[in-house]
Amino acid sequence: MITRLSTLFLRTLREDPADAEVPSHKLLVRAGYIRRVAPGIYSWLPLGLRAVRNIEAVVREEMDAIGGQELLFPALLPREPYETTQRWTEYGDSLFRLKDRKGADYLLGPTHEEMFAATVKDLYNSYKDFPVTLYQIQTKYRDEERPRAGVLRGREFVMKDSYSFDMSDAGLDESYAKHRAAYQRIFDRLGLEYAICQATSGAMGGSASEEFLAVSENGEDTFVRSTSGNYAANVEAVVTQPGVERDIEGLPEAVTYETPVSETIDALVDWANSIDVQIEGREVTAADTLKCIVVKVREPGAEEAELTGILLPGDREVDMKRLEASLEPAEVELAVESDFADNPFLVKGYVGPVGLAKNGVKVLADPRVVTGTSWITGADEKERHVVGLVAGRDFTPDGFIEAAEIKEGDPAPAGEGTLTLARGIEIGHIFQLGRKYTEAFDVQILDENGKRAIPTMGSYGLGVTRLLAVLAEQRHDDAGLNWSVEVAPYQVHVVAANKDAAAIEAAERFAAELSAAGLDVLFDDRPKVSPGVKFKDAELLGMPFALILGRGYAEGKVELRVRGGEKSELDADQAVAQIVEMVAQARN
């Protein structure tokens, strides 16, 4: 097909939008792919919609190739199915809730596990119907507290979500492996740089869970990779190697000291070394101190939040994402001044595990805080710290938690060297849900022996509209976007850069021949626009190939520009065949 720029609904911008922070947001707006309607809500203009449809086509091809069957559920859903799984409550404020005119509760679907499970229950009842994989490409809604970065973190977005149903755990393993491979093919075809990372299951539940993270310095997720081996994980899923337990017999008793100058960990360490405190015969370091972070935890459905103490070594900061992932689906926030005022036993800056336990506050510790480890920590009195407080003797945590930051150079699991940190954007997430949802909906199937059995379920999500933004993040330069042939709204951008009548007529002919060869062509036929503006727009819009008909056409030459690559001069009579071949090669 041919689309003429003279009639295309498009307005390019030379300046970045004021609210844009990341390159993808700036360029997608400037190039006329999207337009803001409200915070986190965007319209898809013709070029943007074509690119999204191209991504959807790749996704459909790969989903169909593994036996997926497409259907479509409504975005507007009743409350009852989500009550069955408790996610009406667990989703908290991120759920868009509404009532109809009769007062019945509804929601805008953030995800559709409930609907898939309930539908399979309604329609299937025999093992002969399984395995089955169903998927949809549907608009989703989440009330993000701080929507940002354009369509990377929006309130309305398009996702592909698929669900496998198998009669056995071995069958689930096979379905999971098929989806994992399909996702790799999708992302490879789209030209993405990504990592497959171990992940937490969160509110989705289930066991095995992996994320596909697109590598990006603007990513909201931090992930780690081992320097040797193949280990990769979202930091939320990294498991800290526990400390070594020690015999508490014969350890010195804890001693409380006046510490008037100890407002920071560094100051506390300097004070300890100034009075020659020894830890295992060496000077004190920040790792020998114990931070007590007070947070408020509200379980789903609870009216009040409960205070909880989080213990971690003083050389580590609390990682709120790791903390939240460890306590999900509960909501977590740091204690504020009013909480300290309402609880006088909380002495800000000097909170310790002993005072928390005495006042009935749950205490969760970093895995390094094990029996026999000795710590310098708050004495629950202003300007006083205790030295030599021993875990398992002087205090005992109620449990352990992954809440401390992961640092570059930390040991990798299984002896695979050390960890390196990188940032990424989640583009896909696959789960082995098991029987959480099929049990909740009492999905009972007759097995080969005529006995009732509950099928096991996998969940596989992929962000379609987010993928477009991620590709813009990874594939751009100072001049504009740089799409792959799989994603580009048009494979070839034909530019009539010469007002000579013969060149304009030839440009028309080239566009027609390229279209006849099966390529999608964007033809810049604007008569009153200068060549310089046309070239700038071509770079901004980002089509992979641009065919320029300029002054050289009189000598039988045309110019081919590969976006982000080389410029070359082609013989006019061979240009179409060469471009068709180059597009075909770029697809492979």
Swiss-Prot record:
Superkingdom per UniProt: Bacteria
GO cellular component: cytosol
Catalytic activity: tRNA(Pro) + L-proline + ATP = L-prolyl-tRNA(Pro) + AMP + diphosphate
Keyword Zinc-finger tagged: no
Record keywords, A-Z: Aminoacyl-tRNA synthetase, ATP-binding, Cytoplasm, Ligase, Nucleotide-binding, Protein biosynthesis
Domain notes for this protein: Consists of three domains: the N-terminal catalytic domain, the editing domain and the C-terminal anticodon-binding domain.
Family affiliation: Belongs to the class-II aminoacyl-tRNA synthetase family. ProS type 1 subfamily.
NCBIfam families, per database record: PRK09194.1, proS_fam_II
Name of this protein: Proline--tRNA ligase
Organism: Corynebacterium glutamicum (strain R)
Lineage: Bacteria, Bacillati, Actinomycetota, Actinomycetes, Mycobacteriales
Gene: proS
